[in-house]
Amino acid sequence: AEVLMDFPQLTMTLPDGREESVMKLTTLVA
C-alpha cells in the first residue's frame, strides 16, 4: 500500500472494467 501512495495519479482497471485512481482505491481499502 505504501508504494501505491507514491503514485496518486495512476489508475487501475477493476475486474468490472471501470478505471479508478490508485489513491481512491487505497482510500477505500483504508
Swiss-Prot record:
It is an enzyme of class 7 (translocase). Keywords: ATP-binding, Hydrogen ion transport, Ion transport, Nucleotide-binding, Translocase, Transport. GO terms for molecular function: ATP binding. It comes from the Eukaryota. Its EC number is 7.1.2.2. GO terms for biological process: proton transmembrane transport. It catalyses: ATP + H2O + 4 H(+)(in) = ADP + phosphate + 5 H(+)(out). Belongs to the ATPase alpha/beta chains family. V-ATPase is a heteromultimeric enzyme composed of a peripheral catalytic V1 complex (main components: subunits A, B, C, D, E, and F) attached to an integral membrane V0 proton pore complex (main component: the proteolipid protein). Catalytic subunit of the peripheral V1 complex of vacuolar ATPase. V-ATPase vacuolar ATPase is responsible for acidifying a variety of intracellular compartments in eukaryotic cells. Two separate genes encode the catalytic 70 kDa V-ATPase subunit in psilotum and equisetum. This is V-type proton ATPase catalytic subunit A isoform 1. It comes from Equisetum arvense.
